[in-house]
Amino acid sequence: MEDIADFTLGITPYDKYRGHDKDTIKKRLFHSDTKIDSTYKPLITGENIQRYFIDNKIKEYIKYGEWLGAKREERFFNEPRILIRQIISGKPPRIYAGYTEESLYFTQIGFGIISKKESINNKYILVILNSLLMNFYHKYMYLDLEKDLFQKILIANCKKLPIREISLEAQQPFIEKANKMLFLNKNLQELSQKFQRLLTRKFELEKLSTKLQDWYLLEFSEFVKELKKSKIKLFLKEEMEWEEIFLEKKEEADKVKNEIEMTDKEIDGMVYELYGLSEEEIKIVEEN
């Protein structure tokens, strides 16, 4: 893959070998909760990097410039690019590769990729990286199969992933699928965040639990239990009203989620064909 793309690690904000003293490092002097001036850039976390899309919700800014430990090339924070989350998760563990054209900066929570060939589209690379086949390959080539938590994708290993070079015309169906996945995931994110804002506003919650953030994955009874954990008790009439709201919004989210899953399977089929897998080989990939 390093033959077709440029890579960068995330920013290293602080480095004692670059002259940063203990006070600067301890107080995180280059970080801020607000955009103080034009040198402060929006900083994402690993959670922002999802499969196919990058959540642009910002909690922090970083003062970007020569004073940083390692500032990296600025094009990796502004140009159309792929971002890979360093920590991979799930059962089986999956690569989280997202695409963005927004001005977003990141530290060592991941790394960036930009195609260095006009004949290779970033979105084509994105689809291959998120495919089941490439996840299978990465898992058995580079991961510790005995370890469940905190597995990582390393930039050195990503550079070795076998991305097939095909014509721009042949890439077009993959690019179209990438665009569809970007649209669907953004739609799901907006639906989810709208409901989260409703919960936060209605119940005056400072922060939602992880399960409440993923409310559309819950059944209504589980949703009520999560509210109770946040010390929110619904009276019978309120519960009936919330059940109607919850089920309506969950149905909307499920429709989008199902379309994402269906498109994912279509992509996997296209990638199997691209790499010439037999039926037996496909079965091995999908069962593992």
Predicted regions and their residues:
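Polybasic, glycine- and aromatic-enriched phosphate-binding surface used to engage nucleic acids
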Residues: 1-176
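Non-catalytic DNA-recognition/assembly elements of restriction-modification systems
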Residues: 1-25, 47-49, 160-288
